[in-house]
Amino acid sequence: GPAGATHHSIEDIAIMRALPNMTLFSPCDPYEVEKITEESINHQGPIYFRLAKKGEPIISNQESKIELGKANFIEKNENSNIAILFTGNASDIALEVSSELKERGVVTDVISFHTIKPFDYETLDKIVSSKKYIFTIEEHSIIGGLGSVVSEYIAESRLNPIFKRFALPDEYSHYVGSQFYIREKFEFTSALISNKILNTLGYKW
């Protein structure tokens, strides 16, 4: 952001994933924060909370149960063969992408993986087994984050969904500006991601 490259934290998930016994929580909204904070009181061991710096809107179904280590379905469409997986403050982009795809007649599941470690492999297995297309979106380095967790799992499975990651490139940012300005500089916007997804789906323009 405006504070410059020294204040960018886009490698933290990768670093924390590598630490034994570390629990890693990357919430998408205040509801997830509230519920996991309550649960963390009785948790044994360290927890790394990856929080955004400003008030994100509540997008979770507040009647749904939020648990540490369990994914949170934000949008669920039984007839869709496409899943968008995201974590943390990429929530706005994930929902904008879903909305833009709907305008093209493409419906998706949108799932918040708020706990990166321990990861919800049970839900991921169901997604990988049932969806033809899987996309991950995260405001983190392309290396070591949510996309890496998912790609590692797919690589070791016998399943073969079409999979693509959307994240920040493996380079330091020399830009100074707002979060949205830097997202645009790195082509990490909903419009560009939507177009890339449509191309992957073979959408005819």
Over which residues does each language-model region extend?
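Conserved thiamine diphosphate
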Residues: 1-83, 92, 201
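Thiamine diphosphate
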Residues: 50-205
